[in-house]
């Protein structure tokens, strides 16, 4: 094996926030052109079969060797130190590329991974399925960004989100474009970028991040944190990683308590973030900020855009997407992102030259022709049945062997045998549980259709044909009798109408003229998944009018599903259950209602009594609330009077009491009091509590509610004389 390449020199790091126009580092700056025509050529590398250098590149079998250098062969990244390398190995991007390499699939760059993960094209490493219906404007923006980032013949060392400068000392500076000014600065006006860099870039930053129920935002004035806030709400389904809103948008809305809690938390998170950003501090900061950095997946962008009073606008030139792979939104992550973006990398040499000379070469080990033939024989030993089960054909193997024969350099990796040894594990990835369920459903439909028609065109060794013919129950007989060549479409139409509450569609099939015998056979047939009938589906969806129509048409409420539940027990609400009771009141002898678990008939007199009782309860509740409101007002008024009386001095209290005694002796009305709150002089001299209904304690001319207040007042009165 050839010697490993030496590591690239570590660039110096300088904070953009500490620079000024007089710093030697920024003197004589000029923008370095990175046009593809002016870029350096790629360094010669040892070619290996299967290598591709495009953005969606395939990993070369020769790049599977292990190196102790500061380089990641899966992501094609060079690191400055071991700490940065360890941090890279924890990223979802690195783990995703590892899985792609094990599956022999194309790898993604950091920018492609960010765009596809935010759009929802990729499931996360933990198994989430994040997808959302984006607007047309967002999709067009993503397409433009993808076309810009996937331009052919991109030179080495070129980064679309970074700008390369050169100073008078011959040093090269890499700076992130998002901290050098707004979008509206065109590329031809390079002097504006140079001026922003020499001035240390913008000083007012607002960084916002949101993902998976987490929100974090901070306002920075240079390095100083002016304000920051984080929120966390439980919005992501456990063991699934899918947000509840995305699950509902896909038409699989759940009615569980956890789903309702997640929907409530999504609404509260939306309200909390909107209220925070609409506050005086944050709204002023968003208006004065020179740069706004944002990171949010496609499903989380509604927190910031759209709707009434949106805090951000998509056309804002100050708004930038964070061009980094981020972790969970926290205050520490916000500080790390801003520190990373405002750090300049200073090189003594041209970084494009460094990429050329320090790019890791592919190390391949030559092998003998005999060993190559043995390996090809092992590949051809895989049986055809196994290849079919794994979704593979023999043609890729033949093409691979022909390409290796045509290649003049006979090279191969030692890990080829390990790759062949793990092919049997891919069977579980190709055939997941969901696909098995679909196959069972398709087989049952094919078998039912085949009972009344010609035999299906299947091979004789079909593994599932024999067991399905052996199992025969009365339920299967009912299904077979109900099924006809056109019945599956009719069943799907009726089921969709029951779930959606389309009463008019059902009336066309049930209420006009004689009912079709095919439709009658489907009314009580448990044909759905889980043994649901049409009555089950309508009751579970809370469609009371549909339930009434089906019962009047002849649907049997005593038919149970696979979990022994009649339609009444799966009803969504009370109004739907009342439809069964109203039907029972009109048709007492039609069915065995104890088997249907209907508790009893519901007459009009019972409904009238219930309505009257509800009105009385509502009136009593309204009266009780009014009394409680008056009592609270009286208590608040008493507390205010007590506080004001206790705040008076002893001289003012004596004067007020003397005026009231004099007015009482003369029989004249009480003199007006300046403060309308102090209207009762019969209060405790110490704490101000009303003495009405109490036996007061006296000493001298003072009255108190308790001996404790008397003792406190006496000690305070005797304190100056002591």
Swiss-Prot record:
EC category name: hydrolase
Compositional bias of kind Basic and acidic residues: 357-382, 606-650
Annotated region described as Disordered, given as residue ranges: 109-139, 357-412, 434-466, 595-650
A Pfam entry, by short name: bVLRF1
Residues in coiled coil: 602-655
Keyword entries, A-Z: ANK repeat, Coiled coil, Cytoplasm, Endonuclease, Hydrolase, Metal-binding, Nuclease, Phosphoprotein, Repeat, Zinc, Zinc-finger
Acidic residues bias (residue ranges): 129-139, 403-412
Residue ranges of the region described as VCP/p97-interacting motif (VIM): 654-666
GO molecular function terms listed in the Swiss-Prot or TrEMBL record: catalytic activity, acting on a tRNA; RNA endonuclease activity; zinc ion binding
Modified residues (Phosphothreonine): 603
ANK repeat coordinates: 489-519, 530-559
Start-end of Polar residues biased regions: 457-466
C2H2-type zinc finger segments: 70-94
Domain text: The VLRF1 domain mediates binding to the 60S ribosomal subunit.
Protein name: tRNA endonuclease ANKZF1
Native species: Rattus norvegicus (Rat)
Organism lineage string: Eukaryota, Metazoa, Chordata, Craniata, Vertebrata
